[in-house]
Amino acid sequence: MAKFQGYLELDRFWKHDFLYPLIFREYIYAFAHDRGLNKSSLLENVGYDNKSSLLIVKRLITRMYQQNHLILVAHDSNQNNVFWSNKNLYSQLISEGFAVIVEIPFSIRLVSSLKGTEIVKYSNLRSIHSIFPFLEDKFPYLNSVSDVLIPYPIHLEILVQILRYWVKDASSLHLLRLFLHDYYNWNSLIISNKSISIFFKSNSRFFLFLYNSHVCEYESILLFIRNQSCHLRLTSSGSFFERIYFYEKIKHPIEEVFSNDFPAIPLFFQDPFMHYVRYQGKSILVSKDTPLLMNKWKYYLVHLWQCHFYVWSEPGRIHINQLSKHSLFFLGYLSSMRLNLSVVRSQMLENSFLMDNAMKKIDTLVPISPLIGSLAKMKFCNALGHPISKSTWADSSDLDIIDRFVRIWRNLFHYYSGSSKKKSLYRIKYILRVSCVKTLARKHKSTVRAFLKRLGSELLEEFFMEEEEVLSFIFPRTYYTLRRLYRGRIWYLDIFCINDFVNHE
């Protein structure tokens, strides 16, 4: 209960725009620690060594405000090296604490069972598999698709400027700006791509919030103009919490803000059949109109990024293709449009005739080559797809080794349940099964043939059981119906993030 009361106190601070005092609360870092242990975030925990105390945080903030980098260079370098050697720990402390503070309003719905607490329930966190039924319904009636890769901000100051629309606590913004600039001064005087990648990797949860704020601001403007042009509510699917902020902005008079920047919507942007779908940093624009209109949207997006967000983007980053001639790689699936040809016989009185009927249907295929590349990168096979033993797992128990391989296979099969051709997954199943046997044989210092001869080839059969067989045990009377469903596409709506082996980008 004390932990829940801490969450409620955070929520009260957020409502009154007082974020800066929360940075000096020690339980903030306890929350970050607990969340890292529970792995409630989509990202892996970067490590926590119980060194985050309130005293360290206060000393860090005080030194950030007082230090002069030009003077530090001239003073004793040995004393400064002690401080610089712990820069990763200090930056992680501040970033984790700040990430907890700004994410609490989104996690507060988890404690809605508390009495006397009025908490808004958000329903925007949808499964990413809900995107594909949308594509199945809309794609047959659309012509052009634009593959958009959202660019990253070239400077973190842009992200701080965007946060000013949400966070009105000037002290928090000042501390955030000082922290970001101070981190770069630790690396070098010139901001390089390497230092940015190091910062993003060591502070992934904190960067996720900053990047989502950038995407939210970009989508707010884009969707506002799109809705102004067609006066229809846009169907957009995603799994991250920045969409909540967008719908919160709708409740406020954002028209007054955007109308000043965009006083008139050009006529050539009026497209009632424009659809926008995004996951992480990749999005697609699909339209029924000609490629000319898509090109106008393309150059509009480039100017929006360059002029409003000061982000350099080339038109070549946005690709426009015809759905009938192009395969779209999105969320690990290779989607394409194909025609189902059928012949219908019609008879009227004494006359009969045949009619050719062509229906568009979307195909969702499994990209086997990128999957094998991911397995090779994780040392389950070589570059040609030949299974090898997982040497790093040879020290585990037999059941643990089998459980790890089975979990990977079932997660992949579960994720690609919407594929129209599941037989292509049998090669992935073969690689994982043989790699599992080779790992067990390596552990027992035996050959694969001798190991299988001693224990039997049926050792792994029950562990790699097909979902079709599992469903037949649960529903034996409807086995043939389930078999037809198995051969078709099944979109499981409990998938909220892309599989690690599927994310090849």
From Swiss-Prot:
Detail the disulphide connectivity of this chain as listed in its UniProt entry: none
Q: Does the keyword RNA-binding apply?
A: yes
What is the annotated signal peptide range for this record? none
Annotated localization:
Plastid, Chloroplast
User: Can you quote a single GO CC term?
Assistant: chloroplast
Ordered alphabetically, the record's keywords are:
Chloroplast, mRNA processing, Plastid, RNA-binding, tRNA processing
Has UniProt tagged this entry with the keyword Plastid? yes
The family database entries (InterPro entries) matched by this protein are listed as: Domain_X (IPR024937), Maturase_MatK (IPR002866), Maturase_MatK_N (IPR024942)
Tell me, which GO biological process terms does this entry list? mRNA processing; RNA splicing; tRNA processing
GO MF annotation list: RNA binding
What is the documented function of this protein? Usually encoded in the trnK tRNA gene intron. Probably assists in splicing its own and other chloroplast group II introns.
Q: Which HAMAP family match?
A: MatK
Q: Which PANTHER family match?
A: MATURASE K
What protein family is recorded? Answer: Belongs to the intron maturase 2 family. MatK subfamily.
Q: What is this protein called?
A: Maturase K
Organism of origin: Ulmus parvifolia (Chinese elm)
